[in-house]
């Protein structure tokens, strides 16, 4: 591997990769598709910085952040890794926006799948 390979690998992660959520019980495809950036992308880097800023703003005078606030900040960070989607509700496409994305990510098994995919560099080769 050369320095060019390293730099190109990180830059390529910015495009994101398609991930289709799997049914949490039987693993079958759900038809819900998300495009997620890789952990070395600039978008992921900015998401981590925004997480730090958000936690700093939420801290009380003693530097403590409630568990509820930490969880909200973590979900916001995870949402910043998703750059587009193909999601339907009934027969209608669901608009891609932060509110709708956080609504989806509030489901525990969805969070787990998105987080695992986003963190695994093998998905971005």
What are these regions (language model features)?
Residues 6-10, 21, 117:
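Extended hydrophobic/Leu-rich segments
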Residues 9, 24-26, 72:
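Generic marker of residues within folded, mature protein domains
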Residues 28-125:
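Short, surface-exposed, charged amphipathic helix/loop patches that serve as local interaction elements
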Residues 1-15:
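Extended acidic low-complexity intrinsically disordered regions
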């Amino acid at each position: 591997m050369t320095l060019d390979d390293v730099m190109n690998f990180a830059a390529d992660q910015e495009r994101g990769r398609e991930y289709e959520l799997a049914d949490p019980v039987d693993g079958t495809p759900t038809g819900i598709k998300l495009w997620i950036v890789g952990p070395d992308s600039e978008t992921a880097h900015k998401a981590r910085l925004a997480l730090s800023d958000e936690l700093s703003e939420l801290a009380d005078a003693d530097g403590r952040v409630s568990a509820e606030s930490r969880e909200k900040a973590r979900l916001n960070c995870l949402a910043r890794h998703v750059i587009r989607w193909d999601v339907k509700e009934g027969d209608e496409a669901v608009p891609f926006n932060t509110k709708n994305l956080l609504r989806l990510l509030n489901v525990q098994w969805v969070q787990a799948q998105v987080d695992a995919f986003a963190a695994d560099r093998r998905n971005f080769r």
